């Protein structure tokens, strides 16, 4: 945690405080993050700022904490990630960690866990470098009546029927 704190103090806070970037985190944040001319999509400047923070975290080796050491990471597990996320959340809203859009200087990467657990060696070779460099990512969208976006309580199932799937 001390290494993460030093990184935040020396790299992230100066970036957050330059060019009025603080507008993305104070009372102006919703308007500053939103491009109203593009139907409410995220503002490109906001996205670029998140990208720069992530690039710095990657260069410092902070972002790759959860990756296995054989893939250039630090073998960080779920408990370690939970401790780091709680530590970052306790610091309040900022460029170091923004739960509104799952941005974090420490990679919170569901795709990594899925790929390590279920990916073939070929898929891992294809996907892991991009996940570690944040040039590739996973996303999923789910919703069910009475469950919203809680992936752990979904009731819909898919059953293989020959070459097809029946939902």
Feature locations, PLM:
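Amphipathic, small/basic residue-rich leader segments at the start of a protein or domain
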Residues: 1-105, 121-126, 130-133, 160-161
């Amino acid at each position: 945690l001390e290494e993460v704190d030093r990184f935040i103090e020396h790299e992230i806070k100066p970036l957050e405080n330059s060019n009025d970037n603080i507008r993305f985190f104070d009372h102006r944040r919703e308007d500053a993050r939103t491009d109203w001319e593009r139907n409410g999509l995220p503002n490109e400047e906001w996205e670029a700022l998140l990208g720069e923070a992530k690039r710095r975290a990657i260069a410092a080796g902070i972002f790759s904490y959860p990756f296995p050491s054989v893939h250039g990471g630090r073998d960080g597990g779920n408990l370690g990630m939970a401790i780091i996320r709680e530590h970052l959340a306790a610091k309040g809203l900022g460029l170091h960690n923004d739960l509104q859009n799952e941005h974090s200087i420490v990679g919170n990467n569901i795709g990594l866990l899925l790929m390590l657990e279920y990916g073939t060696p070929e898929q891992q070779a294809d996907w892991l470098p991009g996940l570690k460099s944040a040039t590739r990512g996973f996303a999923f969208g789910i919703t069910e009546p009475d469950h919203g976006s809680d992936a752990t309580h979904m009731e819909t199932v898919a059953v293989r029927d020959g070459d097809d799937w029946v939902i």
